[in-house]
């Protein structure tokens, strides 16, 4: 088993600290907002600030350290309001400056590529577009309840009240609390100097730890299972106490999933009908070596369709080693008997997400990529989803994590993701009153007219983009080749082999 060292020596860093480099257009930056924004609370010209979650590197050199401040402004914010003027809400950001820890400012030109785990979509020019209010269960039921408000008002009011309780209208406004994560892309190259400062003090694992890891990985299954079917790959391994791990993930904004119960089923239904998030949504049970996971962590914003998630299993005969399978849900897919989440093909992106989030908290003491190649890892499991991976495992050693770094004013674990009851009730009444022949005709004509001016939406960036990964930790150049691990014989369109 080969080990790919993930560390920078101080001498190597200092040797290029005075060299200028060009960060090419197309480079992605992952930014965590410290300013709450929204279509109804933000205005053109409002200032916005955030922090880089992952350090930005190019050709093996750190150019923008982790936790650098990013400044921008609201270029435009269009509220949905009563829906008389606009089909959907929208907001457009313009980030223009990065400030390093030493005070140096770097001008940048960017566009928003994706809002992490959000129901909102992004147009090709970077405008964030909100949901359409009629695309909901409440709107469908309004076709029945709305006429009753006019034909038999007392009965219609009763039916409307019941409908508002069982299928409230979603809030079409955009709201991103502090802690929302944006994936930005440079639209023009940036010249800057490589940084001699590490975002964290990354160390190498000791030979004893590497030997322990090698023995554990060789004796463990490389893929979790759901019943008799292969599922998520083991791509991370943690060394540290249970308490340190819980503190680190809490500081990083990851929360534990709830167990399945009647109450969790109600909350899931509530989130689906309102098109809101459910941060602690239950997850399917997966086993590794015949054992169910000890922890299930996840991170999402305002939708149940998308989330980052990580299952953890305690290593055999030990209390300080944890095997993990990290993946990202990007939507729903339906089967004959049920529906489930569809995962992003590139699981290395999610491995990088987990490590970078923990590194941001300052609780990461050491990390190393362990190269793993095994015939059974590449076997065809007769599934329908494809996986892109270099097959490496990120081995992370945590410190005690008594004082994690937390962005001031940002509560990642409990950010607001649901409208108030008043907002929801008003939205239901508004939609019902609008379901009549006159307004439906007007709304249809308006929708057809405005669609001529709306820009097309981006494809899901989780598949066709390259968010910050772990190149900042690697002694190898960026752009390391990945293997195409297939779940069936034919690769999907656009997949890289």
Which sequence ranges carry the predicted segments?
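Non-catalytic interaction/regulatory modules that flank or connect domains
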Residues: 231, 243-268
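Contiguous beta-sheet cores, especially beta-hairpins with glycine/small-residue-rich turns
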Residues: 21-198, 267
